[in-house]
């Protein structure tokens, strides 16, 4: 993947950059693997906003992705590499020997025409899915299962890759992209390789309208709201927040306040927590 930059013809193109889509080989999805789904727009079943700043955006067709990779010992051929509007990774259409077609997340350096497989006896090659117990130490993997048979739930974003670092008994240790070191059961499946579209984080949005196309609405600072809308709101002019520290719209401490439950069951599986990320950026005290 490459990144295409624009000349400053307009204020919107001055900082704008986009993917050059050079890896895309087909522009129409497989019709049998697409479906229309109404978007939640950040609302729950009662219509109450549960996730702010979502709504609008271009219409999308959902592509059914095979996260389980449960087509065992049946080779498949990669037919296309396609764009998916529902995620930042690319997807590949795979046709298996029995004629069935499925979409998978497109790994980096997986070419059209390559043959992939899933199962405990599959080769250690990009695109193949195996149990963690069969994957050598140091191998990069993605689409990792948390519960055996449930399908991959971790390491699915563009450019993401986890690394197998240790095996002991019934557990395998992976180092995740966040820096967290975690234990997984050896029966959990993972796919060899790194997710493609690795330069996606280097793309500059350039203008507010592109975020609206994606269904992302503006993020308003609490300090410019009224007191009825946010604890930071109100005052004359640019007033301080009037508290000892920043809080959420519901009055809970934020920006560094730990929210993870102390008795969370997965704590026993985490060897080392992920590295800290700084949330105090420009205007970070205003939530």
Curated annotation (Swiss-Prot):
Disordered: annotated span: 1-30, 211-287
Biological process annotations from GO: translation
GO CC, alphabetical: large ribosomal subunit
Single GO term (MF): structural constituent of ribosome
Keyword Ligase set for record: no
Record-linked HAMAP family: Ribosomal_uL2_B
Family the UniProt entry places it in: Belongs to the universal ribosomal protein uL2 family.
Known partners and oligomeric status: Part of the 50S ribosomal subunit. Forms a bridge to the 30S subunit in the 70S ribosome.
Stated name of the protein: Large ribosomal subunit protein uL2
Lineage start: Bacteria, Bacillati, Cyanobacteriota, Cyanophyceae, Gomontiellales
Protein's gene: rplB
